[in-house]
Amino acid sequence: MILTRSLATLGLIGTLVFAPAAIAALKVGAKAPDFSAPAYLAGEPFTFKLADALKKGPVVVYFFPAAHTSGCNVEAHLFSEAIDKFKAQHATVIGVTAGKTDELADFSKETEHCGGKFAVAADAGARIAKKYDALLKLKPGWSDRTSYVIDSSGKIVHVYSALSPNQHVKETLDAVSALATK
């Protein structure tokens, strides 16, 4: 009885801690907030502009907590492995983080992370994450792990929010592929 009650309490606590991230994201059908931000591709600085990227096709904006952290390393590596599949669909991938932004130049070029295959943007003060309702509840100055697929008209067509990095690439690639068949 005590064990059952303890497990139920732990389950409730887990739901309260982790569920808000999935609920907080902007909804499918909403207009994606426009942004520009300092970014890095293969260690080279540039300014990423969502409006410019959308002129080329759909954009995957994936928010991640911080460079050089275990889950974020995995997620970046998975995106780098799949980047050719995104490019085949004329999609741009941009990672956005408010955490450890001073490490993004290295993170963007390291082969075990982004491998120079896609850009990552610095979100100083989490201003972009706030617009996208993608703040990490447990550490409000950092981005949550939430991925958006935005069609070329600027409309959000897919949202996936989960602290585990493992399904973000599959979820976003499936959504981008579905756009191509429309």
Stretches with model-predicted labels:
Residues 8-19:
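Bacterial N-terminal signal peptides
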